[in-house]
Amino acid sequence: MLLLFCICCAFIKLVLAEVNLTFVDYAKLPPKYAELLANLTDQHGMVLFDTADVRFEAYNYLVNNITEINTDTDACLCQLLTGQYTTDCYIFDDSVYEGPENINPSTSILIKD
């Protein structure tokens, strides 16, 4: 019985070693993006499971390369939320966030009813 338990523990450890988890740290994002992300995820944290995922790449771009909010960073935020690669996503008008109701029609799927 103990041997079976050890084998199961070793298997679980092996499986978990292959999983890359990244917890999205809202504090590292620009405040407007952090607020929007927190609201759209009902204040629950986000976890990215695969480093090859477009969401992981978008998150890294937003955390490491952002100097200003623009259409490129809007597209990255959409990629982070949807998991789909897109460049046709504009959230902030002149970098002023006025609430999720002002998200353009191409991102209406991001707004929860």
Swiss-Prot record:
Keywords: Glycoprotein, Signal. Residues 1-17 form the signal peptide. The keyword S-adenosyl-L-methionine does not apply. Pfam families: DUF2430. The keyword Glycoprotein applies. Glycans are attached at residues 20, 39, 65. Belongs to the UPF0321 family. This is UPF0321 protein C569.02c. It comes from Schizosaccharomyces pombe (strain 972 / ATCC 24843).
